Amino acid sequence: MNQSRTLLVVGAHAADFVWRAAGIIAVVTKHGGRTSVVALTYGERGESGELWKDPNQTVENVKRIRHEEATRAAEILGATFQCFDLGDYPLQIDAQALDLLTMLIRELAPDVIITHTERDPFNPDHPLASAAVQRASILASGSGVASGFSTIKPAELFLFEPHQPEHCGFVPTTFVDISAVFPLKQQAMEAMAAQSYLHQYQTEIAKYRANHARRISGRTDIQYAEAFQRVTPT
């Protein structure tokens, strides 16, 4: 996955890619690959608590701030960012949104797609995003699609680590050494000021997964790592 030429990361909310996949994004772009980040929502309702402490806050202003934060974080990592702005808590994905996602996947033709786990009892938006991404990926590459539409080579599908992996059925199959690019992940996390409380937590997770990566690989130089679960068979 480190050497993928084209990577697509799809999150339910604007900041999801930063906590869960900033490292692999930076690794891919460092090696000359291209990464696109898509957020289905800005997380304006359920994931912008710090911003709502302002009694004069508005939904549109929260969206603006989250867009600026996510765009800045993506730029730090060498990626592009776009948001479908579907609205969160609850996220609703209709046929039009699914078509939009399918067309984007067809246009980007990614080698690898990373998204949420299929289960998350603590966040109803994440499983919906995961299901939509998997369905759109199949529609973009499936032989059953009408011949009037172009299709692409199927992408490898991975799931990034949720905040509570034990409750989401997350079993890591792939560890990525992000030690060399961890300063970039730190900068990207710092750009997401609306969720600053997650910075230290995600740093500790990267150290925790590095310990697993060292044991599995035998490499003693891994200081920070990200964990992923492969869906598509090899």
Language model segments and positions:
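Active-site rim/loop-helix segments in enzyme catalytic domains that contact anionic ligands
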Residues: M1-L108
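Metal-dependent de-N-acetylase/amidase catalytic core
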Residues: M1-L8, L91-T234
